[in-house]
């Protein structure tokens, strides 16, 4: 529910978690912000449903393809970001403009097809564009984020969208002052090594969950 409450997923988006090398769980297509364990379905890396009631999201092919191409990835988020998607509809590339944005210093590729990724062919094309990166933008559509864990993936999604928001705010004041590549690489490496951003965002997730449980 954290990404929903912050407006990152709304009615469009989904989160998955790898359970084993050849299978993962993903929330059902019809779900909103209040997903429970029983609301997930389990798929294999061919997109076949193994367990669970209901149908997976229409774009489960995104998750299938990324998990298949990236053994290092254990969680995937796809969402329609208000701020990050704006950079796919202009000539300005999204780059790190804020310290936390340096987590994406190695580049943010853009998948050029605006259509839904509903089949293995488009899924494989998206995974190819993603390559070894943490995030890929999807032109006029949204973004897909990856992580070695659900905690890291949710944190990366939050910080990715926050960097895009800051970049757009900066552009309203004049020419954005992007962090240069060398500085971004050094700062990003420090953040990844220390893991501070991931821990802080996950602490926010847990705090919001506790507050919601007390209502």
Regions found by a protein language model. Give the residues of each.
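Glycine-rich flexible loops
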Residues: 1-215
């Amino acid at each position: 529910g954290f990404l929903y409450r912050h407006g990152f997923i709304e009615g469009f988006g989904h989160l998955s978690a790898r359970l084993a090398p050849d299978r993962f769980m993903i929330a059902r297509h019809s779900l909103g912000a209040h997903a429970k364990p029983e609301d997930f379905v389990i798929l294999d890396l061919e997109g076949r449903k193994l367990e669970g009631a209901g149908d997976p999201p229409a774009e489960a092919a995104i998750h299938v393809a990324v998990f298949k191409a990236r053994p290092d990835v254990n969680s995937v988020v796809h969402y329609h970001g208000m701020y990050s998607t704006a950079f796919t509809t202009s000539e300005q590339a999204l780059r790190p403009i804020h310290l936390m944005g340096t987590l994406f210093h190695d580049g943010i590729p853009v998948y050029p097809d605006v259509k839904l990724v509903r089949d293995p062919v488009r899924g494989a094309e998206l995974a190819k564009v993603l390559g070894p990166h943490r995030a890929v933008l999807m032109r006029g559509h949204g973004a897909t984020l990856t992580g070695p864990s659900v905690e890291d993936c949710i944190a990366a999604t939050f910080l990715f969208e926050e960097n895009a928001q800051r970049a757009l705010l900066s552009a309203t004041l004049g020419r954005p002052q992007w962090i240069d590549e060398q500085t971004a690489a050094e700062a990003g490496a420090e953040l990844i090594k220390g893991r501070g951003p991931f821990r802080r965002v996950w602490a926010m997730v847990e705090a919001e969950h506790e507050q919601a449980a007390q209502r």
